Amino acid sequence: MIAITLPDGSRREFPGPVTVAEVAQSIGAGLAKAALAGRIDGQLVDTSFRIEQNVDLAIVTDKDTDGLDVIRHSTAHLLAYAVKELYPEAQVTIGPVIENGFYYDFAYKRPFTPEDLVAIEKRMAELAKKDEKVTREVWSRDDAVKLFEGMGEKYKAEIIASIPEDQEIGLYREGNFVDLCRGPHVPSTGKLKVFKLMKVAGAYWRGDSNNEMLQRIYGTAWAKKEDQEAYLHMLEEAEKRDHRKLGKLLDLFHLQEEAPGMVFWHPKGWQIWQAVEQYMRGRLAGAGYSEVRTPQVMDRGLWERSGHWENYKENMFVTESEKREYAIKPMNCPGHVQIFNHGLRSYRDLPLRLAEFGACHRNEPSGALHGLMRVRGFVQDDAHIFCTEGQIMAEAKDFNDLAFSIYEDFGFENVAVKLALRPDKRAGTDEIWDHAEEGLRTALRACGVEWEELPGEGAFYGPKVEYHIKDAIGRSWQCGTLQLDLVLPERLGAEYVAEDNSRKRPVMLHRAILGSFERFLGILLENHAGALPLWLAPEQVVIMSIADAHAEYAESVAQSLQKQGFRASADLRNEKITYKIREHSLQKVPYLVVVGDKERDGNQVAVRARGNVDLGSMPVSTFVERLQNDFANKS
């Protein structure tokens, strides 16, 4: 007998081997029809998978996150199937699932056009409607290479040839199409009902710019039509909110080819930056951090000792001077350890919290650069906490509380927490990693937050807690991190004198809340569609005179507001007041003030809040109270 334990704890027994699909059928016809895959002892498998021993089994449907991934993965294969049907000379390469969709890379003699995408999508729908069965076959590596070479698929043959000889090769077949894949896939193409091809872009074979340029077709796929429509609506809204467009419209910043991935901040954009930095500086000081500054360029030897040279060199800018090799820092942590090491530290000095608005540079691929969101030169709200093991829990809780409070001030109240675990390429022993990972789990439990675990996503020197904020249109952005590092203090010789006079290694907590300033400002701009709250707005108030006779009064109001700390200016141009209002409204200024005879003679101001909300006339003192209240409430 084979016993199958289901997620609710119930057991079903079968006299012999049974497939996932057969188990689903035994539970109910509805579940059997909805089944897309199975999860056996945590491992995803096809519905055709044959169970030959006692296992824990969950039936995966489109209601599961895994189910959506199976749909998207299968739709990527459907895309390749359709392309091969329409363009037999095209060669297939790879087609993974990505956030909200999938892509597939093709080698073809000419660029795919928008008209081609329409034709391909139509063919995909036809193939899905045929409801062809998707089957898995197991091949030897060499036979699989011969199969794809015989079909003229040199890229696929190259991928398979790089797999160890003793490893079995999984191929999936649907109709006339066969492809290499680990799976799982939907049981038949009829399960794929909601999809759309989005765009085509260039991509190098194996991500290497020395290789051939391929064509990458992006698509999205969903379980329900309404989910796809909501996603497409979100994309339309995101297009309107694109921070690159807002940066140009509002004259905040620009980028240019002479400095790829580096930002030219204009006065108004820099004003936003300074508002954020001053706010963060105050919050950090209040939380017991000391601000420091470390060098931009440091000798290769330090990066070798820290482990960055071995694990991170491909992302570092390297230079040479007087026969010495240097690296421009990609992160601040080794520099902060040098400050910790300068002088003898006692347990009484701990926890020591060192913060730096540190300018870093990383050699990101040019194709990955994207406005403020992905740059080569950036500033982090970086800090490192040196503490004892006994202090980890309290420090993690304090940081968690600080991070949530700061996100709330910036208007982000939906925050998800994730724990990224050890990657394949890492420093330190498994014992150290076990200790570090469990330390963060314990700290998160103490914070009372729920979290999701991400295997393989940690930094090379330690696991990390990630803070993902959700914006106004439902997108998730990873900003803050808390990383527990037992490796770097060891490698760089950090130590303190313990209470018993012995020398001990401190625990090092790497932490950031905003991440990079550039990216966070891009997120802020898109979240607010450029209409930043008063405390962040580069121009908070514009006072507009109706005629020349009101210019002196308008100027005096502006100067009064400036003396009280507000970013105010006077527009005294000889233009129609409606023109001025429209112009400054497009600049998304929070408050527009109009002054004429009535306002001048009564020491009042006529106020319009952003969005053309007429607040009427009021004394200047009343308006100042409103500004102060908005500022205090971060509204």
Swiss-Prot record:
Cofactor requirement: Zn(2+)
Q: How is the cofactor bound?
A: Binds 1 zinc ion per subunit.
Provide the alphabetized UniProt keywords.
Aminoacyl-tRNA synthetase, ATP-binding, Cytoplasm, Ligase, Metal-binding, Nucleotide-binding, Protein biosynthesis, RNA-binding, tRNA-binding, Zinc
Work out whether the entry's keyword set contains Transit peptide.
no
What are the start and end residues of every segment in region (Catalytic)?
Answer: 242-533
Per UniProt, Zn(2+) binds at: 333, 384, 510
Query: What EC number(s) would the UniProt record show?
Result: 6.1.1.3
Describe the reaction catalysed, as an equation.
tRNA(Thr) + L-threonine + ATP = L-threonyl-tRNA(Thr) + AMP + diphosphate + H(+)
- A single cellular component GO annotation: cytosol
Outline the extent of the TGS domain.
Answer: 1-61
Molecular function (Gene Ontology), one example = threonine-tRNA ligase activity
What family, per the record?
Belongs to the class-II aminoacyl-tRNA synthetase family.
Its subunit composition reads: Homodimer.
Stated role: Catalyzes the attachment of threonine to tRNA(Thr) in a two-step reaction: L-threonine is first activated by ATP to form Thr-AMP and then transferred to the acceptor end of tRNA(Thr). Also edits incorrectly charged L-seryl-tRNA(Thr).
What's the protein here called? Threonine--tRNA ligase
